[in-house]
Amino acid sequence: MKNKFQKSRNIRIFISSTFQDMQSERDMLVTKVFPRLRQIAYERNVTLTEVDLRWGITEEEAKSSKVVEICLDEIRNSHPFFIGLLGERYGWCPSKETLIEHQAMPDRYEWLAADLDRGMSITEIEIQYGVLRSLEPVYASFYIRKTDEKTIETDPRQAQLKETVRNNKRYNTYDYCSPEQLGEQVESEFKTLLDHLFPKNKVEDP
C-alpha cells in the first residue's frame, strides 16, 4: 500500500538545527545538495522541497514571535521526512511564560508545556516531536558535527541529546567534519531513499 506522499509524489524534508552555528551546513544543503536531489526527484515526477526556517531571523527575534508554532506545524506537514543537524550548542530554551506572554503557545500541542517545563530547547523539541516520539515510521537521518579538541561541550543536555539520537536505531546517524562531507552524506542518504520510494524504472506520469 502506498503512503500519502507516494500517492501525491510530493516530499517535504524538514531541516532541524540550532539557529546560529549551522549556517554553513544549511547553506551547503540548500544551495548545493537539494538542487541536485530536486532534479533527481523531478526525473521521477516527484516534487521535493526542503523546509529551511532560517528566514534571516535571529534567536532574539524568534523569542518574541510564533516561531515555535511555525516549526511544529512545518514538522507535521513534512512528516515523515526529517534531517537533524547537531553541533555544540543546545539552543534556545524558551520558558512557557514567555510564549504565553507573546500568545505563541499553540493549543493543539498540549504536550509542549511539559517539555518547556523540563527546560528543553526548541531544537530538542523538534527532534522529539518529529522523530523520537513518532509512533509512525519515519524517514529521518541525523548528522553530528565532530568536535575538535579545542571545543568543549559545556551543556550536558546537548551531550545527552546526542547520545539519545545515536542509540535509536530507527534511522541512520552520521558524523561529519565539514559542510562538504555533510553534503555528500545527505545526498547519498536521500538518493537511496528516492530509489526506495520512487524506483527509477517505475516512473509514473504526472
Where are these regions (language model features)?
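Conserved catalytic or regulatory cores that recognize and/or transform ribose-phosphate-containing ligands
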Residues: 1-206
